[in-house]
A protein has these predicted regions:
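Macrodomain-like recognition of ADP-ribose-binding/processing modules
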Residues: 1-140
């Protein structure tokens, strides 16, 4: 997933790496937060778009593989990350054009947590549906 975003939105990837380095001494402090990054118009992922994309980095686990957080913790961190994202989108919508349908903010995302974190998609999906955003889920 990260490789795809790095290729499509290299400007955001650089900022994401810097953000993670700033928090390297306490990566757990990022859990339940979302880092929303505005991409640059020159990023390949913005080709043909009317407005530049924003990339939301949701911190739901601070490790993967055997060291990953429990599924319950990841789902809870997803819920908290979504609350954080919603508040950022509400502020952003006051000054920037963002994708909306019938006045509801739209978020496009892959099936998060289902890959390296091995959380059943249905558990993540149930949390996402609680939030006041329209989510378009795609499979890569």
């Amino acid at each position: 997933m990260a490789a795809i975003f790095k290729k499509q939105f290299p400007s955001t990837y650089k900022l994401y790496v810097e953000h993670c380095k700033k928090h390297a001494s306490n990566p757990s402090g990022l859990l339940g937060s979302t880092y929303l990054i505005k991409s640059e118009s020159s990023d390949p992922g913005n080709s043909g778009r009317e407005n530049v994309a924003y990339v939301a980095c949701m911190f739901t686990s601070d490790a993967f593989g055997r060291r990953k957080n429990s599924a319950d913790d990841i789902v809870e961190n997803t819920d908290n990350s979504m609350h954080h994202l919603e508040s950022q989108l509400a502020e952003l919508a006051k000054t920037e054009p963002i994708e909306q349908q019938e006045g509801v903010n739209v978020v496009n995302m892959p099936k998060i947590n289902a890959g390296l974190f091995n959380v059943p998609w249905e558990e993540t999906e149930a949390v996402l549906k609680k939030h006041q955003v329209l989510i378009n889920v795609y499979v890569i």
